[in-house]
From Swiss-Prot:
Keyword presence, Magnesium: no
Keyword Metal-binding (UniProt): no
Organism of origin: Escherichia coli (strain 55989 / EAEC)
Quaternary structure, from the entry: Part of a tripartite efflux system composed of MdtA, MdtB and MdtC. MdtB forms a heteromultimer with MdtC.
Domain of life: Bacteria
Full protein name: Multidrug resistance protein MdtB
Function: The MdtABC tripartite complex confers resistance against novobiocin and deoxycholate.
Broad class of the protein's primary localization: membrane
Pfam families with a match to the protein in the record: ACR_tran
Length: 1040
């Protein structure tokens, strides 16, 4: 058998082979830079994704959902709708709260979006109610970056109002000052206030009204500038006792005189220190608490930030009263640490397996040491580049490095194997290194750039998924590029110094046995290849069959978006009858908490009741269930959810919706389940007609579970139907009626108490303890034009009606969100298709539109772009290979290996019961870059044999296949073993890593078996095609 002639120049490696000291120092510099970079990199669960979302919250205590919509939400929406770069605007108007969520284009800087939002709020100020307690407040919201830590502050002795004040002025501020902390938000609604509860009978007996009391309080408590005196010799600042600070001072306030005797506020009202909003509450386990959610600054190291918070907690606790306790309810870094540690372990295991497979093939310790140095050097050097690119150590970048283990060793293996071949033939190590490195240099460059070309389309994905995987793709590309540099510099230099004929020929019993085994395998392969080359059309039919099979598998495989992770935290929504009060809901919440805390997997529970920026109505409650670490519980999160829902089903009058929290969260609003589908109309009446019909259909679908809707139109309303004629005769306006009702039942904030540390409100309301329900309306009194007191019942009738508990808009039109989960035996793709089919059967009118939201919308977008992404990767690789080979034909031969990888990956996913999700698709794209390596190594040597030895194409490709069989097998097994730890992972975050490993292992196994035989056949086929084309052109030229 003829041997391919090596190059004698050494190519780009010559300088580094001849200067070992310089090469060594260069590699040491790369190593040190990587170590320094590793220590400087922040740690997070996923790459930093700037999601330009701003939330505008406006509180108007006492306002109904209808009033909030028309008076607050609509004016703001009209202004926001004129902003450039706005992608979507959604709003939720409920009792006393308006929440508008503005989602901007990913390309718009968040600072610019903030400026536009502030300008829009300023423009809408004159259109908002004049008695709005506070202007709209906006805040940056990043759904992809949830709180890193949740703390609960409880006390066995202090009132919760004092605890809230202490937390707001002392604890939260201290935590906010920690480096890396971005925002600290409080839940629990126990801000201190002076509450004035009017006795309706007492003020009526004295001929007073609530408006009289409100005016008196407002005028008695002011805080304004008074000026100063500037005399000839001294200046004096003016001050006065215009502020009342305590409930006792308010009790003594004179609100009127009767028969010359003063009437004090304490005579007609109960004045006490209380909470600003008595319809808000938070609980930690079974204790009422103030809950703090801590979010990090963008780019901050989540691990060091959490450690700093924990280090400060003992110091903070010592400064608080002994009865106050600060408890860590949840800490995301616990799971992040575990996930990152598991991924780092899998990375080390991949390195160990790759080195083991190298030794198995080379059977030589010096030859094994060389790639054993090249692999960690390439990976560690990548950290230095990651620092300059502002990347982080996260699950995706570590996955990229784990996969890169199998990639980066390929280059070193190819170089070592080629150099070793020349040494075994009798060449001196230095000469062999020069010849072997020079001969293989173009192959290394081809392998490197064609593999990087596969990753290029990932960089141009414009959606949130593209932003997420940008770090993955660049990290992998950098590792591959450094690997190529190391393989062309350090590897041949070490081969020249460490390898020799004696070391390569030195064999033990294992070496001799394995050598014979490999010789038999190569001989068997040679015989099989000869038979395949004699029956090319049969082999070609097999190749075409794999292409057809890959298309069929792609169509029928279950499809998903992102693997459901077990992060140890469950979000829940508790739903009660629509007429439930705060007290009733709080009681139900405590019953549910008792049931949940009995589960052996639950560590702690946080719950919240009341209307605020995230909770839409009094009949719902938010829950956060913190599970024990994965190693301390028997079941994963999905089984725990099923068990908890079964247990809570026994609690009457409530529905519980649970979903595991995810590292990747795209939804901009609090949802009951993982996936959302919206129904939008031009009016609420249209929604009330079609939502029940669609819900009935969807609840019958086996592809969906936990189907629910935020459409709640059975909220009780006491409609005050005023006889306007009668009211007019008495000189009573509708504004007087509204003011009287607001004073009595709106928890009206009528004044502000200013202190050195904080500001507190004075709250006015009627004392309804003795007159609960609708009977309280009979106590309302108004003042007529002649000063008389008129009962509300004399000019109005009270009608009980139903109305929505909240009014939701999407881009200024009414909308309803239908939430759903997907059962274990179905995929998200099945659910989406079932919903779309059901929608068609309803024949919805043209004024009703439907759309998926959040993760489901992202799934549709990712699914639609996946095919184009793969096509782009193939085209990019064809262009690079065409440029490198200066040929239109050879790149097609190389790319013919791709269908085999697709078949293997899709079959492996189906056998493992995994969906074709974003992670698996990334694995398939990487396979495109890996499997073509086999063809490149074959074709490079075949072309060289034809060019330099004058061999026929059949002899050249046959010899190339036999010569490159061992490095092909080594590189494929190295890539396979690099992905194997990901496929077998079982720890925290394994759900994210496993699909990538499964797809890559399956694709590599199938492609390895098939491409060793199909590639030579296709090479010869295209060679004949090229000859036929040339002969045709030659004939045409002769005829011309």
């Amino acid at each position: 058998m003829q041997v391919l002639p090596p190059s004698s120049t050494g190519g780009p490696s010559r300088l580094f082979i001849m200067r070992p000291v310089a090469t060594t120092l260069l590699m040491v510099a790369i190593l040190l830079a990587g170590i320094i970079g590793y220590r400087a990199l922040p740690v997070s669960a996923l790459p930093e994704v700037d999601y330009p979302t701003i939330q505008v919250v406006t509180l108007y205590p006492g306002a109904s959902p209808d009033v909030m919509t028309s008076a607050v939400t609509a004016p703001l929406e009209r202004q926001f709708g004129q902003m450039s770069g706005l992608k979507q605007m959604s709003s939720q108007s409920s009792g006393g709260a308006s929440v508008i969520t503005l989602q901007f284009q990913l390309t718009l800087p968040l600072d610019v979006a903030e400026q536009e939002v502030q300008a829009a709020i300023n423009a809408a100020t004159n259109l908002l109610p004049s008695d709005l307690p506070n202007p709209p407040v906006y805040s940056k919201v990043n759904p992809a970056d949830p709180p890193i830590m949740t703390l609960a502050v409880t006390s066995t002795a202090m009132p919760m109002t004092q605890v809230e004040d202490m937390v707001e002025t002392r604890v939260a501020q201290k935590i906010s000052q920690i480096s890396g902390v971005g925002l600290v938000t409080l839940s629990g609604g126990q801000r201190p206030a002076v509450r004035v509860k009017l006795n309706a009978q007492a003020i009526a007996a004295l001929g007073l009204t609530s408006e009289t009391v409100r005016t008196a309080i407002t005028g008695a408590n002011v805080n304004s500038a008074k000026g100063s005196l500037d005399g000839p010799s001294r200046a004096v600042t003016l001050s006065a006792n215009d502020q009342m600070q305590s409930a006792e001072e308010y009790r003594q306030l004179i609100i009127a005189y009767q028969n010359g005797a003063p009437i004090r506020l304490g005579d007609v009202a109960t004045v006490e220190q209380g909470a600003e909003n008595s319809w808000l509450g938070a609980w930690a386990n079974k204790e009422q608490a103030i809950v703090m959610n801590v979010q990090r600054q963008p780019g901050a190291n989540i691990i060091s930030t959490a450690d700093s918070i924990r280090q400060m907690l003992p110091q903070l606790t010592e400064s608080l009263p002994k009865s106050v306790k600060v408890t860590v309810l949840s800490d995301r870094t616990t799971n992040i640490r575990a996930s990152v540690d598991d991924t780092q372990f899998e990375l080390m295991m991949a390195i160990a397996l790759v080195v083991m497979i190298i030794y198995l093939f080379l059977r030589n310790i010096p030859a094994t040491i060389i790639p054993g140095v090249a692999v960690p050097l390439s990976l560690i050097g990548t950290f230095a580049v990651m620092v300059f690119l502002d990347f982080s150590i996260n699950n995706l970048t570590l996955m990229a490095l784990t996969i890169a283990t199998g990639f980066v060793v390929d280059d070193a293996i190819v170089v070592i194997e080629n150099i070793s071949r020349y040494i075994e033939k009798g060449e001196k190590p230095l000469a062999a290194a020069l010849k072997g490195a020079g001969e293989i240099g173009f192959t290394i460059i081809s392998l490197t750039f064609s593999l990087i070309a596969v990753l290029i389309p990932l960089l141009f994905m414009g959606d949130i998924v593209g932003r997420l995987f940008r770090e993955f793709a660049i990290t992998l590309a950098v590792a591959i590029l450094i690997s190529a540099v190391v393989s062309l510099t350090l590897t041949p230099m070490m081969c020249a110094r460490m390898l020799s004929q004696e070391s390569l020929r030195k064999q033990n019993r294992f070496s001799r046995a394995s050598e014979k085994m490999f010789d038999r395998i190569i001989a068997a392969y040679g015989q099989g290849l000869a038979k395949v080359l004699n029956h090319p059309w049969l082999t070609l039919s097999v190749a075409l069959s794999t292409l057809l099979l890959s298309v069929l598998l792609w169509v029928f495989i279950p499809k998903g978006f992102f693997p459901v992770q077990d992060n140890g935290i469950i979000q829940g929504t508790l739903q009660a009858p629509q007429s439930s009060s705060f007290a009733n809901m709080a009681q139900r919440q405590r019953q549910v908490a008792d049931v949940i805390l009995q589960d052996p997997a639950v560590q702690s529970l946080t719950s919240f009741v009341g209307v605020d920026g995230t909770n839409p109505s009094l009949n719902s409650a938010r829950l956060q269930i913190n599970l024990k670490p994965l190693e301390e519980r028997d079941d994963r999160v999905q089984k725990v959810i099923a068990r908890l829902q079964t247990a809570v089903d026994k609690v009457p009058g409530v529905d519980l919706f649970l979903q595991p929290t995810q590292d990747l969260t795209i939804d901009t609003q609090v949802s009951r389940t993982q996936y959302q589908f919206t129904l939008q109309a031009t009016s609420l009446d249209a929604l009330s007609t079609w939502v029940p019909q669609l819900m009935e259909k969807l609840q019958q679908l086996p592809q969906l579970s936990d189907v629910s809707s935020d459409w709640q139109d059975k909220g009780l309303v006491a409609y005050v139907n005023v006889d306007r004629d009668s009211a007019s005769r008495l000189g009573i306006s509708m504004a007087d009626v509204d003011n009287a009702l607001y004073n009595a039942f709106g928890q009206r904030l009528i004044s502000t108490i200013y202190t050195q540390a904080n500001q507190y409100r004075v709250v006015l309301e009627h004392n309804t303890e003795n007159t609960p329900g609708l009977a309280a309306l009979d106590t309302i009194r108004l003042t007529s034009s002649d000063g008389g007191v008129v009962p509300l019942s004399s000019i109005a009738k009270i009608e009980q009606r139903f109305a929505p508990l909240s009014i939701n808009h999407l881009d200024q039109f009414p909308v309803t969100t239908i939430s759903f989960n997907v059962p274990d035996n179905y995929s998200l793709g099945d659910a989406v298709q079932a919903i779309m089919d059901t929608e068609k059967t309803l024949n919805l009118p043209v004024d009703i539109t439907t759309q998926f939201q959040g993760s489901t919308l992202a799934f549709q977008s990712a699914l639609g772009s996946t095919v184009w992404l793969i096509v782009a990767a193939v085209v990019a690789m064809y262009i690079v290979l065409g440029i490198l080979y200066e040929s239109f034909i050879h790149p097609i031969t190389i790319l013919s290996t791709l269908p085999t990888a697709g078949v293997g990956a899709l079959l492996a996913l189906m056998i493992a019961g995994s969906e074709l999700d974003v992670i698996a698709i990334i694995g398939i794209i990487l396979l495109i870059g890996i499997v073509k390596k086999n063809a490149i190594m074959m074709i490079d040597f075949a072309l060289a044999a034809e060019r330099e030895q004058g061999m026929s194409p059949r002899d050249a490709i046959y010899q190339a296949c036999l010569l490159r069989f061992r490095p092909i097998l080594m590189t494929t097994l190295a890539a396979l073993l690099g992905a194997l730890p990901l496929m077998l992972s079982t720890g925290v975050g394994a759900e994210l890593r496993r699909p990538l490993g499964i797809g890559m292992v399956g694709g590599l196994i199938v492609s390895q078996v098939l491409t060793l035989f199909t590639t030579p056949v296709i090479y010869l086929l295209f060679d004949r095609l090229a000859l036929w084309t040339k002969s045709r052109f030659a004939r045409h030229e002769e005829e011309a």
